[in-house]
C-alpha cells in the first residue's frame, strides 16, 4: 500500500508540469468542499486534480452512453473520485481467498421450491447502517459482521452493529491480515472458537491494525457454524438469500466503473471472476427487466445508492459474485 502511494507522489513533480483544465476550477473546488477534501501539499493536490479530471471524463463519457441506452447503470464523482483503481484496490479491497481445497460445501439445495421474485432484508430490519472502512482493507470483516448481524436479528429480534475492528485485530492466526486483507469464513471460524464477538459500540472501528482488545463482557453475538455455497451457482445463492438471510460474497471491484458507480444495474464486460473485495448480498430483484443482486458495500453512504450497488444477476456469475458465498449461523 505504501509503495503505491510513494510511486504516485514520486511522480508528482512531473505531474505538476502537466496542465489542468482551468474551466474545471469551480467544479473541482465544489467537489472538494462536498467531500471535505484537504491536501497537505500543492504537489499532492496537483496529482489528485489530474486523477480527478481523468475520472470525470470517464464518468461523463459513460453517462453520455448511458443516455443513449448503451449501459444499465450510471456513474458519479463520489468521494473516491480523486483515486485510481490501483489505489482503491490497495487501500480498500484486500480479499484473501483461501485455497480451493479448503472449502467445505455443506449447503443442501432444494431446487423445486418456489422463491419470491424479490428480496430485500432491509425491509425486515435485518441490515445495519452502511459503514465506511476507510484506508484499511477490512472489507472482509464488514461483510462477515453484516451477515452475522442479520442472523442475530432473526434469532433475537435485536439489530446490533458488531465489531469489525474485533475481527481486524484478533483473527490473524486464522489467516487474516487485518487491514491487509482477510476472508469471511476465517472470520466466522475465529468467532466460533472465540465463543463470541464484541459490539461495535464497545469495540469501535479505527481503520488501522491494533492489539486485540476483545472483552467477553461486551460480547454481542456468537456463531455456531458457517455454511459455504457451491462455486458459481447463482440459483443456489438466490435460494440461500431468500431462505437464510444476507450472504457474504467476493466480487471483482477493480474497475473505475465499480468504484464510481452511482445507480442502476451494474454490468461491465471487463469485470472478471477474480474476486478481490468482500461485500454482502442482502437481496435480489429486477429493474426494468434487468435482474440484479442487491449488495451492501463498506465504502460509506456516498458510494452508489446510499452505500449499495445493484449488480447483474444471472449473467454468468458476473464479477465472480457467486464464486465464494457463505453465511454464518448462531
From Swiss-Prot:
Cystines in this chain: 126-223, 136-179, 170-212, 271-319
List of glycosylated residues: 104
An annotated GO BP: antigen processing and presentation of exogenous peptide antigen via MHC class II
Record-level Gene Ontology MF annotations: cysteine-type endopeptidase activity
GO cellular component, one term: lysosome
Keyword rRNA processing attributed: no
Enzyme class: hydrolase
UniProt-listed Enzyme Commission number(s): 3.4.22.27
Keyword Signal assigned: yes
InterPro entries xrefs: Papain-like_cys_pep_sf, Pept_asp_AS, Pept_cys_AS, Pept_his_AS, Peptidase_C1A, Peptidase_C1A_C, Peptidase_C1A_papain-like, Prot_inhib_I29
Active site: 139, 277, 297
Record's catalysed reaction(s): Similar to cathepsin L, but with much less activity on Z-Phe-Arg-|-NHMec, and more activity on the Z-Val-Val-Arg-|-Xaa compound
Function, as annotated: Thiol protease. Key protease responsible for the removal of the invariant chain from MHC class II molecules and MHC class II antigen presentation. The bond-specificity of this proteinase is in part similar to the specificities of cathepsin L.
Record family assignment: Belongs to the peptidase C1 family.
Protein name as annotated: Cathepsin S
Provenance organism: Saimiri boliviensis boliviensis
Amino acid at each position: 500500500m505504501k509503495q503505491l502511494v510513494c510511486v504516485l507522489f514520486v511522480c508528482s513533480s512531473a505531474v505538476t508540469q502537466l496542465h489542468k483544465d482551468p474551466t474545471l476550477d469551480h467544479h473541482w473546488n465544489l467537489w472538494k468542499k462536498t467531500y471535505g477534501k484537504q491536501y497537505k501539499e500543492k504537489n499532492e493536490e496537483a496529482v489528485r486534480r489530474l486523477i480527478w479530471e481523468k475520472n470525470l471524463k470517464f464518468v461523463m463519457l459513460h453517462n453520455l452512453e448511458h443516455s443513449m441506452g448503451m449501459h444499465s447503470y450510471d456513474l458519479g464523482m463520489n468521494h473516491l473520485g480523486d483515486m485510481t483503481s490501483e489505489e482503491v484496490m490497495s487501500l480498500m479491497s484486500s480479499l484473501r481467498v483461501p485455497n480451493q481445497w479448503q472449502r467445505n460445501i455443506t449447503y443442501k439445495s432444494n431446487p423445486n421450491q418456489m422463491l419470491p421474485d424479490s428480496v430485500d432484508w432491509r425491509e425486515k430490519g435485518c441490515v445495519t447502517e452502511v459503514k465506511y472502512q476507510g484506508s484499511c482493507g477490512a472489507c472482509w470483516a464488514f461483510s462477515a459482521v453484516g451477515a452475522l448481524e442479520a442472523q442475530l436479528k432473526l434469532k433475537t429480534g435485536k439489530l446490533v452493529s458488531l465489531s469489525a475492528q474485533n475481527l481486524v485485530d484478533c483473527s490473524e492466526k486464522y489467516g487474516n491480515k487485518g487491514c491487509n486483507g482477510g476472508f469471511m469464513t476465517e472470520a466466522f471460524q475465529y468467532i466460533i472458537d472465540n465463543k463470541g464477538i464484541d459490539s461495535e459500540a464497545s469495540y469501535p472501528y479505527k481503520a488501522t491494525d491494533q492489539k486485540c482488545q476483545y472483552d467477553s463482557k461486551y460480547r454481542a453475538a456468537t456463531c455456531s457454524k458457517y455454511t459455504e455455497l457451491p462455486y458459481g451457482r447463482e440459483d443456489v445463492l438466490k435460494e440461500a438469500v431468500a431462505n437464510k438471510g444476507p450472504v457474504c460474497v467476493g466480487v471483482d471491484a477493480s474497475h473505475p466503473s465499480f468504484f464510481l458507480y452511482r445507480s442502476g444495474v451494474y454490468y461491465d464486460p471487463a469485470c472478471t471472476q477474480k474476486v478481490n473485495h468482500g461485500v454482502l448480498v442482502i437481496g435480489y430483484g429486477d429493474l426494468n427487466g434487468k435482474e440484479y443482486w442487491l449488495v451492501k458495500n463498506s465504502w460509506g453512504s456516498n458510494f452508489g445508492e446510499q452505500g449499495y450497488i445493484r449488480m447483474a444477476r444471472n449473467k454468468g456469475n458476473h464479477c465472480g459474485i457467486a464464486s465464494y458465498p457463505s453465511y454464518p449461523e448462531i
